[in-house]
Amino acid sequence: MAQLIDFQKVRRRMWRKRLHNLLFLAGFAAIVFGVSFLVYHNGNMDLRTAVNTVTAEFASGSGYPVVLPGGRLLGMSYMDNGLIITADSNLYTYNNTGRRMLDVQHGMINPTISVAGSRFLAYDRGGTKVMLFSRSNQLRQVSTDFAIYDGDMARNGNFALASRSDRHLSQVIAYNGDGNIICRYLFSRRPAVCVSLADSKDAMTVGLLDAQNGDFLSVISRYQFPIENPTASIELPGELILHLNYQDGSNIRAITDQRVILFNSDMKETASFSYGEQQLIRFQYGQDGKLALYLRDATGERKGRAVVLNDHLEALCSVPQNADPNGMALENGILYLSQSGEILLYNFTGKQTGHYAINGLGLIQPMGDTLYYTTGSELCTITSKEIMDRTSQRGSSKNASESSSTASQRRGSSEESESASSSSRRSSSSDAESSKMEQSASDRWEMVKDALLGSESEAASQDGEKTEKTSSSQPEASSASEASSISESDPESEVKE
């Protein structure tokens, strides 16, 4: 007898089998995608380190503020989805929920940070110690035999160190992400004081310093690994090279004591921004490539201006200041300045959009719309919108208070006028007395108003005097003909006077 076939059951069985195969392929694709994401997101880290890094990044903390560990804070830097705090003894990293991802003793006297994406290089300027980190792990440690002048790290994992040498005046050694030497460049006539790596290719620029006719002579050279000789060079007579920034494959920015210069890959100057008669005190790179400068007037006072430059070194804004800022940062079209315990916000038209006073204000570092700041014992956050809203509310309250005081004064004056008018109908002597009272009330209002304005001006002048006294305790700026040094905590640097 023929067996009947239930085609409905056959179809269901085939559909389940097909679904099983699709789920298996989807799971396999997810694993491949996850591994690819880890490799791309964390460069040439091993898989275990990459997994730990991503896990630490997304692990939840208790939020901000967080209590900072002991030690003197030296600097604060941003990295991809993380914050780096440099103390005199330890390095710390935090994610955006306040979770501490890294806590390690660095053992350096002058720790300096160079950030590249989700990793950063820590080296002892003037010392010999070098350490590489992810957000949550120490990747490796490299020891050099000679004092380090400068260092830089690229997103592709390469890093370079400019240092002294035994048989030559200086050297620059380029390493890959595993800490193996790619190239070694020796310089017998000039010390290499600056180095910057390209993120997307095996190339770097080196700044060399020399003297000519009693003045500085800076030389900038571009190198392509593993070619021994420079592919292009340029001399800058009379200028002191302070910092190099290899933006991408075709643009190189050089900061000297006199100007900021933009070069192409052939080291041909394409743009320049001069400081004029002012002196460079501080500079800061933004995450979008813009550059902020603080320039002090040559009058001997602590007055100056903060300038924001775009990628073509065109000035977007110039903000006058009556005192040197303690900190400066750029993010999302906002210039942040910290000064005398207050955070000042400016847009790129130069208009002040907010200000916020904070007791014990220390370091500042914006990431996105959030500003991270320290207060001595805590790491805190506030958004730029919150600062602007609070500024607006204070302004509205002040205007309302002034309007109320003015209305009250007008009512008082009106009542006194009516009283004076009534008294004048009684006697001429009373009229004279009423006039005296009205004039006295008016004078009192003017006196109170002047006192209020005067107290604000006096407070501002006292703040200025305090700032001036604090600043005057530091040595005055050296002239352009004298050797200067750079103290850099990447991405923010400050010229030591």
Question: Would you name each region that the model predicts?
Answer:
Residues I364-G395:
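Blade-level signature of beta-propeller repeat domains, shared across WD40, Kelch, NHL, RCC1
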Residues H168-V260:
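Solenoidal tandem-repeat scaffolds enriched in leucines and small polar residues
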Residues G70-G75, M108-G117, F146-R155, R189-A198, ...:
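Repeated scaffold domains used in trafficking and secretory/extracellular systems
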Residues D103-A203, G207:
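Non-cytosolic head/periplasmic domains of membrane-anchored proteins
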Residues M1-H20:
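N-terminal Lys/Arg-rich, disordered targeting/topogenic segments
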Residues L74-T86, I113-D124, V130-M131, G157-D166, ...:
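Short beta-strand elements that form the blades of beta-propeller/WD-repeat-like
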Residues T128-M131, R167-I173, N213-R222, V260-F263, ...:
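Structural motif
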Residues A56-L68, R99-Q105, N137-S143, N180-L186, ...:
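A short beta-strand motif characteristic of beta-propeller blades
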